[in-house]
Swiss-Prot record:
Keywords: Methyltransferase, S-adenosyl-L-methionine, Transferase. It catalyses: L-glutaminyl-[peptide chain release factor] + S-adenosyl-L-methionine = N(5)-methyl-L-glutaminyl-[peptide chain release factor] + S-adenosyl-L-homocysteine + H(+). This is Release factor glutamine methyltransferase. The keyword Transport does not apply. One of its GO terms (biological process) is methylation. Substrate binds at N184, P185, P186, Y187. Belongs to the protein N5-glutamine methyltransferase family. PrmC subfamily. It comes from Deinococcus radiodurans (strain ATCC 13939 / DSM 20539 / JCM 16871 / CCUG 27074 / LMG 4051 / NBRC 15346 / NCIMB 9279 / VKM B-1422 / R1).
Length: 278
Protein backbone atom coordinates (compact mmCIF):
# COMPACT_ATOMS: atom_id res chain seq x y z
CA UNK A 1 0.00 0.00 0.00
CA UNK A 2 1.22 3.48 -0.85
CA UNK A 3 1.72 5.95 1.97
CA UNK A 4 -0.89 8.38 0.64
CA UNK A 5 -3.46 5.56 0.47
CA UNK A 6 -2.63 4.54 4.02
CA UNK A 7 -3.20 8.13 5.12
CA UNK A 8 -6.59 8.18 3.37
CA UNK A 9 -7.69 4.94 5.01
CA UNK A 10 -6.35 5.96 8.42
CA UNK A 11 -8.17 9.29 8.20
CA UNK A 12 -11.41 7.51 7.33
CA UNK A 13 -10.98 5.15 10.30
CA UNK A 14 -10.45 8.02 12.73
CA UNK A 15 -13.37 9.93 11.23
CA UNK A 16 -15.67 6.97 11.86
CA UNK A 17 -14.38 6.80 15.44
CA UNK A 18 -15.31 10.45 16.04
CA UNK A 19 -11.76 11.71 16.54
CA UNK A 20 -11.94 15.54 16.39
CA UNK A 21 -9.02 16.08 13.96
CA UNK A 22 -8.80 12.82 12.03
CA UNK A 23 -6.52 13.80 9.15
CA UNK A 24 -4.02 15.68 11.31
CA UNK A 25 -3.90 12.87 13.87
CA UNK A 26 -3.53 10.22 11.17
CA UNK A 27 -0.64 12.09 9.58
CA UNK A 28 1.12 12.70 12.88
CA UNK A 29 0.80 9.05 13.86
CA UNK A 30 2.11 7.85 10.51
CA UNK A 31 5.02 10.29 10.68
CA UNK A 32 5.82 9.00 14.16
CA UNK A 33 5.58 5.31 13.32
CA UNK A 34 7.57 5.66 10.09
CA UNK A 35 10.14 8.06 11.53
CA UNK A 36 9.41 10.79 8.98
CA UNK A 37 9.27 14.55 9.33
CA UNK A 38 6.54 16.51 7.57
CA UNK A 39 8.61 17.23 4.44
CA UNK A 40 9.70 13.61 4.03
CA UNK A 41 6.14 12.45 4.55
CA UNK A 42 4.89 14.70 1.74
CA UNK A 43 7.70 13.73 -0.62
CA UNK A 44 7.24 9.99 -0.09
CA UNK A 45 3.48 9.82 -0.48
CA UNK A 46 3.77 7.54 -3.50
CA UNK A 47 6.12 5.05 -1.87
CA UNK A 48 5.04 1.56 -0.90
CA UNK A 49 4.83 0.80 2.81
CA UNK A 50 6.17 -2.58 3.94
CA UNK A 51 3.87 -4.99 5.79
CA UNK A 52 5.63 -4.59 9.15
CA UNK A 53 5.45 -0.80 9.02
CA UNK A 54 1.83 -0.94 7.90
CA UNK A 55 0.95 -3.25 10.79
CA UNK A 56 2.62 -0.89 13.28
CA UNK A 57 0.80 2.05 11.74
CA UNK A 58 -2.58 0.37 12.02
CA UNK A 59 -1.90 -0.58 15.63
CA UNK A 60 -1.43 3.11 16.45
CA UNK A 61 -4.42 4.16 14.37
CA UNK A 62 -6.69 1.65 16.12
CA UNK A 63 -5.52 2.81 19.53
CA UNK A 64 -6.27 6.41 18.53
CA UNK A 65 -9.67 5.26 17.26
CA UNK A 66 -10.19 3.89 20.78
CA UNK A 67 -9.55 7.51 21.88
CA UNK A 68 -6.16 7.00 23.48
CA UNK A 69 -4.69 10.55 23.45
CA UNK A 70 -2.45 11.32 20.50
CA UNK A 71 0.32 12.45 22.86
CA UNK A 72 0.31 9.06 24.61
CA UNK A 73 0.80 7.34 21.26
CA UNK A 74 3.60 9.58 20.01
CA UNK A 75 5.00 9.78 23.53
CA UNK A 76 5.80 13.46 23.31
CA UNK A 77 4.42 16.97 23.08
CA UNK A 78 6.01 20.33 22.28
CA UNK A 79 4.84 22.79 24.93
CA UNK A 80 6.08 26.22 25.95
CA UNK A 81 9.26 25.81 23.93
CA UNK A 82 10.14 22.54 25.69
CA UNK A 83 9.81 19.01 24.31
CA UNK A 84 8.10 16.80 26.89
CA UNK A 85 7.49 13.11 27.26
CA UNK A 86 3.77 12.50 27.74
CA UNK A 87 2.09 9.36 29.06
CA UNK A 88 -0.61 8.17 31.43
CA UNK A 89 1.33 9.20 34.55
CA UNK A 90 0.22 12.83 34.25
CA UNK A 91 -2.27 15.12 32.57
CA UNK A 92 -1.47 15.85 28.93
CA UNK A 93 -0.37 19.53 28.83
CA UNK A 94 -3.11 21.61 27.23
CA UNK A 95 -2.48 24.40 24.71
CA UNK A 96 -4.56 26.86 26.75
CA UNK A 97 -2.17 26.47 29.68
CA UNK A 98 0.57 28.08 27.59
CA UNK A 99 -1.21 31.38 28.28
CA UNK A 100 -0.69 30.74 31.99
CA UNK A 101 3.02 30.49 31.20
CA UNK A 102 2.77 33.80 29.33
CA UNK A 103 1.08 35.47 32.31
CA UNK A 104 3.74 34.09 34.65
CA UNK A 105 6.55 35.45 32.48
CA UNK A 106 4.75 38.80 32.33
CA UNK A 107 4.59 38.82 36.13
CA UNK A 108 8.30 38.07 36.50
CA UNK A 109 9.74 40.36 33.83
CA UNK A 110 10.99 42.92 36.37
CA UNK A 111 12.35 40.41 38.91
CA UNK A 112 16.09 39.88 38.55
CA UNK A 113 16.35 36.38 40.04
CA UNK A 114 12.85 35.15 40.82
CA UNK A 115 11.92 32.29 43.10
CA UNK A 116 8.99 30.42 41.61
CA UNK A 117 6.84 27.53 42.82
CA UNK A 118 4.73 25.40 40.47
CA UNK A 119 2.09 23.52 42.48
CA UNK A 120 0.78 20.31 40.92
CA UNK A 121 3.42 20.18 38.23
CA UNK A 122 2.28 17.00 36.42
CA UNK A 123 4.60 16.54 33.45
CA UNK A 124 6.68 19.48 34.68
CA UNK A 125 5.52 21.60 31.75
CA UNK A 126 5.00 24.90 33.57
CA UNK A 127 8.10 24.61 35.73
CA UNK A 128 10.30 23.66 32.79
CA UNK A 129 8.78 26.31 30.53
CA UNK A 130 9.55 28.95 33.16
CA UNK A 131 13.10 27.71 33.69
CA UNK A 132 13.73 27.62 29.94
CA UNK A 133 12.52 31.21 29.56
CA UNK A 134 14.25 32.56 32.70
CA UNK A 135 17.42 30.50 33.24
CA UNK A 136 18.39 32.50 36.34
CA UNK A 137 15.10 31.69 38.08
CA UNK A 138 15.05 29.31 41.03
CA UNK A 139 12.15 27.01 40.18
CA UNK A 140 10.60 24.46 42.52
CA UNK A 141 7.73 22.15 41.60
CA UNK A 142 5.49 19.95 43.74
CA UNK A 143 3.07 17.14 43.06
CA UNK A 144 1.10 14.74 45.21
CA UNK A 145 1.56 11.93 42.67
CA UNK A 146 4.90 10.08 42.72
CA UNK A 147 4.12 8.83 39.21
CA UNK A 148 3.70 12.36 37.89
CA UNK A 149 6.90 13.47 39.61
CA UNK A 150 8.85 10.62 38.04
CA UNK A 151 7.67 11.85 34.63
CA UNK A 152 8.50 15.47 35.49
CA UNK A 153 12.02 14.47 36.54
CA UNK A 154 12.46 12.56 33.28
CA UNK A 155 11.39 15.65 31.35
CA UNK A 156 13.81 17.84 33.30
CA UNK A 157 16.64 15.44 32.49
CA UNK A 158 15.57 15.32 28.84
CA UNK A 159 15.60 19.11 28.56
CA UNK A 160 18.69 19.65 30.71
CA UNK A 161 16.84 22.11 32.93
CA UNK A 162 17.52 22.40 36.65
CA UNK A 163 14.24 22.33 38.58
CA UNK A 164 13.79 21.12 42.17
CA UNK A 165 10.96 18.59 42.52
CA UNK A 166 9.23 17.89 45.83
CA UNK A 167 6.62 15.20 46.49
CA UNK A 168 3.71 16.34 48.61
CA UNK A 169 0.32 18.02 48.74
CA UNK A 170 0.07 21.63 47.56
CA UNK A 171 3.08 23.58 48.92
CA UNK A 172 4.44 20.36 50.45
CA UNK A 173 5.59 22.20 53.55
CA UNK A 174 7.68 24.70 51.59
CA UNK A 175 7.70 28.12 53.21
CA UNK A 176 9.34 30.14 50.44
CA UNK A 177 9.26 33.00 50.21
CA UNK A 178 8.41 32.95 46.52
CA UNK A 179 7.99 35.80 44.06
CA UNK A 180 5.37 33.76 42.23
CA UNK A 181 3.28 30.70 42.96
CA UNK A 182 1.70 29.30 39.83
CA UNK A 183 -0.64 26.36 39.46
CA UNK A 184 -2.89 24.54 37.05
CA UNK A 185 -4.65 22.53 39.78
CA UNK A 186 -7.50 20.06 39.39
CA UNK A 187 -10.49 22.33 38.79
CA UNK A 188 -13.34 20.36 37.25
CA UNK A 189 -16.52 19.64 39.22
CA UNK A 190 -16.70 15.93 40.01
CA UNK A 191 -19.98 15.66 38.07
CA UNK A 192 -18.06 16.41 34.86
CA UNK A 193 -16.55 12.92 34.96
CA UNK A 194 -19.78 11.47 33.56
CA UNK A 195 -19.63 13.59 30.39
CA UNK A 196 -15.86 13.85 29.91
CA UNK A 197 -14.38 13.40 26.43
CA UNK A 198 -13.03 9.87 25.87
CA UNK A 199 -9.45 11.16 25.75
CA UNK A 200 -9.81 12.84 29.14
CA UNK A 201 -10.57 9.46 30.72
CA UNK A 202 -6.96 8.48 30.03
CA UNK A 203 -5.73 11.30 32.28
CA UNK A 204 -5.42 10.71 36.04
CA UNK A 205 -8.59 11.69 37.93
CA UNK A 206 -6.31 13.18 40.59
CA UNK A 207 -5.25 15.85 38.08
CA UNK A 208 -8.77 16.71 36.92
CA UNK A 209 -11.53 16.72 39.51
CA UNK A 210 -11.86 18.85 42.65
CA UNK A 211 -15.18 18.43 44.39
CA UNK A 212 -18.67 19.72 43.76
CA UNK A 213 -17.66 23.15 42.41
CA UNK A 214 -14.14 22.29 41.26
CA UNK A 215 -12.46 24.43 43.93
CA UNK A 216 -11.58 21.84 46.58
CA UNK A 217 -7.89 22.11 45.67
CA UNK A 218 -7.68 25.80 44.78
CA UNK A 219 -9.13 27.00 48.10
CA UNK A 220 -6.55 25.32 50.38
CA UNK A 221 -3.84 26.28 47.91
CA UNK A 222 -4.78 29.93 48.35
CA UNK A 223 -4.66 29.54 52.13
CA UNK A 224 -1.16 28.05 52.03
CA UNK A 225 0.11 30.52 49.43
CA UNK A 226 -0.74 33.57 51.52
CA UNK A 227 2.17 33.02 53.91
CA UNK A 228 4.65 31.81 51.28
CA UNK A 229 4.83 34.86 49.00
CA UNK A 230 7.25 37.77 49.24
CA UNK A 231 5.61 41.18 49.80
CA UNK A 232 4.03 42.02 46.46
CA UNK A 233 4.38 38.42 45.25
CA UNK A 234 1.67 36.95 43.04
CA UNK A 235 -0.47 33.85 42.81
CA UNK A 236 -1.49 32.71 39.33
CA UNK A 237 -4.06 29.96 38.81
CA UNK A 238 -5.69 28.31 35.82
CA UNK A 239 -9.28 27.36 36.61
CA UNK A 240 -12.51 26.45 34.91
CA UNK A 241 -14.30 29.48 33.42
CA UNK A 242 -17.32 28.42 35.50
CA UNK A 243 -15.48 28.85 38.82
CA UNK A 244 -12.65 31.34 38.22
CA UNK A 245 -14.88 34.37 39.01
CA UNK A 246 -16.09 32.65 42.18
CA UNK A 247 -12.57 32.13 43.50
CA UNK A 248 -11.53 35.67 42.56
CA UNK A 249 -14.46 37.04 44.58
CA UNK A 250 -13.51 34.85 47.56
CA UNK A 251 -9.92 36.09 47.32
CA UNK A 252 -11.04 39.71 47.41
CA UNK A 253 -13.22 38.99 50.44
CA UNK A 254 -10.18 37.45 52.15
CA UNK A 255 -8.09 40.57 51.58
CA UNK A 256 -6.37 39.79 48.29
CA UNK A 257 -6.23 41.98 45.20
CA UNK A 258 -7.57 39.61 42.57
CA UNK A 259 -8.57 39.74 38.93
CA UNK A 260 -9.77 37.26 36.36
CA UNK A 261 -7.84 37.13 33.09
CA UNK A 262 -9.25 35.66 29.88
CA UNK A 263 -7.67 33.00 27.74
CA UNK A 264 -7.11 33.51 24.01
CA UNK A 265 -10.75 32.66 23.29
CA UNK A 266 -12.02 35.25 25.79
CA UNK A 267 -13.08 32.76 28.46
CA UNK A 268 -12.44 33.71 32.10
CA UNK A 269 -9.86 31.03 32.84
CA UNK A 270 -7.05 32.59 34.91
CA UNK A 271 -6.94 34.24 38.32
CA UNK A 272 -4.10 36.57 39.25
CA UNK A 273 -3.93 37.64 42.90
CA UNK A 274 -1.64 39.31 45.37
CA UNK A 275 -2.04 40.27 48.99
CA UNK A 276 -3.61 43.70 49.45
CA UNK A 277 -0.90 46.30 49.97
CA UNK A 278 1.65 44.25 48.04
Amino acid sequence: MQLRDLLTQATARLTRAGVPSPEVDARLLLEHVLGLNRTAFLLRGGEEIGPDAEARAWDSIERRAARVPLQHLTGEVEWGGVRLTSDARALVPRPETEWLLHLALEELRRVEKPRVLDVGTGTGALALGLKAAIPQAEVTATDLSPEALSLARENAALSGLDVKFVEGSLLAGLSGPFNLIVSNPPYLPTADRATADPEVRHDPDLALYAGEDGLDVARPLVAEAAAALVPGGALLLELDPRNAPTLAAELRTAGWQAEVRPDLTGRERFVRARRAGG
